[in-house]
Amino acid sequence: MAKQIQAIRGMNDCLPEQTPVWQMVEATLRRVVSSYGYSEIRMPVVEMTNLFQRAIGEVTDVVEKEMYTFNDRNGDSLTLRPEGTAGCVRACIEHGLVYNQERRLWYVGPMFRHERPQKGRYRQFHQFGVEVFGLTGPDIDAELIMMTARLWRELGIAQFTTLQLNTLGSSAERAAYRDALVTFLEQHKESLDEESQRRMYSNPLRVLDTKNPQVQEILQHAPTMADYFGEETKAHFSGLKALLDAAGIAYQVNERLVRGLDYYNYTVFEWVTDSLGAQGTICGGGRYDGLVEQLGGQATPAIGFAMGLERLTLMLETLEQIRNIPSTVDVYICMAGEGTLTAGLLLAEKLRSERPQLRVMTHCGGGNFKKQMKRADKVEARIALILGETEVAEQKVTVKFLRDQVEQQTVDVTALLPILAQLGE
């Protein structure tokens, strides 16, 4: 027997039993972001490797360890996108979307990172992202956070999320702090773990994000970033906090919050939850005012966020917040007897034309009515329409309600639509 071919480790199928949850989440995301007036953009899943090296930073874990990179037949180095912001910025520069313009965009799709697969975190994962270009004030920072807060309310998980907030200051302020942090870390080098020692010179801010308790204890005595902020940074952060206070959105200022990518400045934020076991991030974002220029465009302020849909759906399932997801079939048409197959198929087409929101499935493959009714129940249809030879001859149809305590009735085909109209209510 030939060896069975299986999916690649960490890249999972989304089966028919799972897709209704995904569709519900994606529909909620689309509805909310559209209510803010944002437009969808779609980018390719493969980009030139140097895009991510320049955008994310060559000494980040993503670029050093996690990217799926390969050479194509022309010898070009290509990479499956590990995140969406870099590709979105590239597309906006290439097509002239951001020069002296304001843009508010969103996207959703698969991303790829060669990480150790674990629950809610996979090598192919799906990300919903929002990016805004051309706006500098704390008002747009607040709008994105308000948008995410609205998403949690719509999904019924607001009470299980906590907003963590920080500012990284300007690039000059961050550079000054970086030097001070390196000096401090050098004084404690022998006490740092191998990972922190590696990052100490290449990306010292990432040491602040360590999970090692011993290093965390050392960092309690490290210089703080706030000591290096000027008035502009302080005013921006104060303005953001005032807007969030006015909106009633609670937050925790976390001075150790730096995010995992090099391009952030000023505002950074994460939504975290304890509902997935150890505290985990379900959404993160921040400002990246220098990235457009860094990738070859004109200097353009920008801010965005992204959330992983696998972690979000896992959270919904864990908290049992998945409810009122409709079945995939409204009407199941059962047919048995001479001439009923044609009548059933034509009736189904008529219903799809006149009630396009109805999901109509016709039974195929023959079998008696008992077998067909079992199938109707298995697909969780709400109504079965039964066509026998008598019904076809008299241009009638028998209506059987499968989920409601309503008596079965036989009606003229012309009277069927008003009965089915209540399915859309």
From Swiss-Prot:
Among the Pfam families in the record, one is HGTP_anticodon
- Does the keyword Protein biosynthesis feature in the UniProt annotation? yes
A GO MF annotation of the entry reads: histidine-tRNA ligase activity
Disulfide-linked positions: none
Q: Which GO terms describe its cellular component?
A: cytoplasm
Q: Which UniProt keywords apply?
A: Aminoacyl-tRNA synthetase, ATP-binding, Cytoplasm, Ligase, Nucleotide-binding, Protein biosynthesis
| Gene3D superfamilies referenced in this protein's UniProt entry, alphabetically | Anticodon-binding domain, Bira Bifunctional Protein, Domain 2
Q: Does the keyword Cytoplasm apply?
A: yes
Record GO biological process: histidyl-tRNA aminoacylation
- Describe the reaction catalysed, as an equation: tRNA(His) + L-histidine + ATP = L-histidyl-tRNA(His) + AMP + diphosphate + H(+)
Localization of this protein: Cytoplasm
Which parts form a coiled-coil structure per UniProt?
A: none
Matching entries from PROSITE patterns are given as: AA_TRNA_LIGASE_II
Q: Give the EC number(s) listed in the UniProt record.
A: 6.1.1.21
Matching entries from PANTHER family are given as: HISTIDINE--TRNA LIGASE, MITOCHONDRIAL-RELATED (PTHR43707:SF1), HISTIDYL-TRNA SYNTHETASE (PTHR43707)
According to its UniProt record, which protein family does this protein belong to?
Answer: Belongs to the class-II aminoacyl-tRNA synthetase family.
Subunit composition and interactions: Homodimer.
| Protein name as it appears in the record | Histidine--tRNA ligase
Q: Which organism is it from?
A: Tolumonas auensis (strain DSM 9187 / NBRC 110442 / TA 4)
